[in-house]
Amino acid sequence: MNYQQQLANSAAIRAEIQRFESVHPNIYSIYELLERVEEPVLQNQIREHVIAIEDAFVNSQEWTLSRSVPELKVGIVGNLASGKSALVHRYLTGTYVQEESPEGGRFKKEIVVDGQSYLLLIRDEGGPPEAQFAMWVDAVIFVFSLEDEISFQTVYHYYSRMANYRNTSEIPLVLVGTQDAISSTNPRVIDDVRARKLSNDLKRCTYYETCATYGLNVERVFQDVAQKIVATRKKQQLSIGPCKSLPNSPSHSSVCSAQVSAVHISQTSNGGGSLSDYSSSVPSTPSTSQKELRIDVPPTANTPTPVRKQSKRRSNLFTSRKGSDPDKEKKGLESRADSIGSGRAIPIKQGMLLKRSGKSLNKEWKKKYVTLCDNGVLTYHPSLHDYMQNVHGKEIDLLRTTVKVPGKRPPRATSACAPISSPKTNGLAKDMSSLHISPNSGNVTSASGSQMASGISLVSFNSRPDGMHQRSYSVSSADQWSDATVIANSAISSDTGLGDSVCSSPSISSSTSPKLDPPPSPHANRKKHRRKKSTSNFKADGLSGTAEEQEENLEFIIVSLTGQTWHFEATTYEERDAWVQAIESQILASLQSCESSKNKSRLTSQSEAMALQSIRNMRGNSHCVDCDTQNPNWASLNLGALMCIECSGIHRNLGTHLSRVRSLDLDDWPMELIKVMSSIGNELANSVWEEGSQGRTKPSLDSTREEKERWIRAKYEQKLFLAPLPCTEFSLGQQLLRATAEEDLRTVILLLAHGSRDEVNETCGEGDGRTALHLACRKGNVVLAQLLIWYGVDVMARDAHGNTALAYARQASSQECIDVLLQYGCPDERFVLMATPNLSRKSNSRNNSSGRAPSVI
């Protein structure tokens, strides 16, 4: 075992010890809090539940299950629209539940293969597969919905992520297309040919179509994957030989038993009425009482025998707290946690690099053991031993840094980076239907010899003569998928010629460019004691003549916002590119995970991800509103539309009076903004702004920026394609009042696009005085209220009785409208709302021959 593997194992062990030992202090804290519950009956009921949880934890499978009981570990991945949660629930309970679980779940069930019982561990992953997941599974089920294109494309992304962490030829794969969501209004979009092509691309894995509503092929999927795992193990045993045969039971994974997060109440089985044979929160053990599971061990010097107080029954595996000092015990726990290396982030990349000293006069280069962790921190230590002991180390927070390679100009940022947190949309910017995976030696090629904009190559591992495996990598961050780049030892590649931008960080870049890279800077001319060749052939102006000289520059620099620099050097340029790419990905991930300091009412991360996903699910939002680029990640708030990053830059130049641009990934999203975006969408927006564009060619992904800018300015600034007004009999302001009262969103958008500030502020009449904002707030419609404010309605306006729109929002009990009005400076005056006459809701346009304005409520 090499030292990196040993280090990773050691870190994983320490993390598991920390997790395990963190449980009983929390349980003790619950017992102490229970003493504050004054009602005895409630106190005892809660205590019994805590005791049951405690006993279930201490009697988990790693402590009780015999080693003769084998385990099968199955991972299930797919985005929120894939239907994977319904698939698992149907298999476990025999019933159908439509809701998808964003956080996934952990489940256990007995399964019989070839007459032998196995403990089936099912891990429903809430997001893309990570390294821990990839190393844990025995097999993976990829799930997509037959009516959802994005969930289909997500499988390519998740497969490539798996290939980054593990050789996919080692584990069985199964592809599942779910039919649950198909209906007359929601037709199938993934035909059988495309689905089977995907199964061939995924190393010719088995493909099933399932329906959780009535159980089609559900049992068959899990039975097949279990049989594949058993067959793979037998094959491995035969290949190893009798002297090194594998044990009957694989090592028990503490991760599975420890991270049981989802609790599902078992329902009646198919025809028996008894409890189902699975449990998602405790291991499947024989039906034995808790007392029978306990073994009284005589006290010894090494094994303390704690005694529970009657009023505070606690697990006999935990030490007694009777008479102990809570502060001392807490300190003891902390010190013990420190001794096992608690709190250390697990590195995602590590190795020896040269670092240039920033203090010494000669700026000498010294060896450092460098680690990059998934928390966005890069650390370096004088040696591996110092890292293991966690001494003499220094950290670099990558959040406010960028990484540079001397002598190379940063390429144009590539487009189609998608949100991390949104499980359904993964930012797949290209059509991946042309993907091909070659069966020989894990290499991957596209459909043709040349790079294609629509082709993406996936790979698992590249074999090397020394028996080691070289892992592939891409420019995508933890939950993102961007246009991959062609790197010497990369396995994920696509054409970068169409790339325009990146979601959040300009430092994310491709490694190739259609143009020659500029020569290295004079910094590369310094002699390094570890350099194999000298790069001294620079011209007087610091320019180099050949590309080979540029590649000999093995240095990369991390630069902070404060101007501080850290110089590192690798041994090969492949290693340098790998470090640069990994650091760029962590910079992007850090930017996307940082919380805004604005004091806004934000949703939880999970609910916000679901809310943003609802925006992406709006009709037309899978493509840019102006150029049809796939998976746009930028929004125009007042237009209610999504766009690509290049078009968003053009929209910014229009001014906020025409387009208010915001990033889906990087900016705050209060509820009122989410409601606006999830109420309009690109299809509705273009039905207003592009209705008159017949015969005109709309820009595409391949169009130049100038072509896109001409289209956007003609569309929004000159309003050349805007739909005509629906009615000319009444003034625009009166039509706006009517449309607001009827909550006709499309008409309101159209009238606001045509209207001026004066027309938007027109009132119902002298005896009424209400503006469209008053009417929107009376309805409690925060979407219309927000749109009216953006288009210039006066939030200070009062009706004939002196009431502002805030009074109407309070009457409607619409906290969202109240918050928006206060945010824009509406006076917080709590007057008693004076009634205004309720006029007929029906339009008088047909019978109104005198030209009176249409009445509103």
From Swiss-Prot:
GO terms for cellular component: cytosol. It is found in: Cytoplasm. The modification N-acetylmethionine is found at M1. GTPase-activating protein for ARF1 and, to a lesser extent, ARF5. Directly and specifically regulates the adapter protein 3 (AP-3)-dependent trafficking of proteins in the endosomal-lysosomal system. GAP activity stimulated by phosphatidylinositol 3,4,5-trisphosphate (PIP3) and, to a lesser extent, by phosphatidylinositol 4,5-bisphosphate (PIP2). Phosphatidic acid potentiates PIP2 stimulation. GTP binds at residues 78-85, 122-126, 178-181. ANK repeats lie at residues 768-797, 801-830. The modification Phosphoserine is found at S521, S605, S663. This is Arf-GAP with GTPase, ANK repeat and PH domain-containing protein 1. Transmembrane segments: none annotated. GO terms for molecular function: GTP binding; GTPase activator activity; GTPase activity; zinc ion binding. It comes from the Eukaryota. The modification Phosphothreonine is found at T836. The keyword Cell membrane does not apply. SMART domains: ANK (SM00248), ArfGap (SM00105), PH (SM00233), RAB (SM00175), RAS (SM00173), RHO (SM00174).
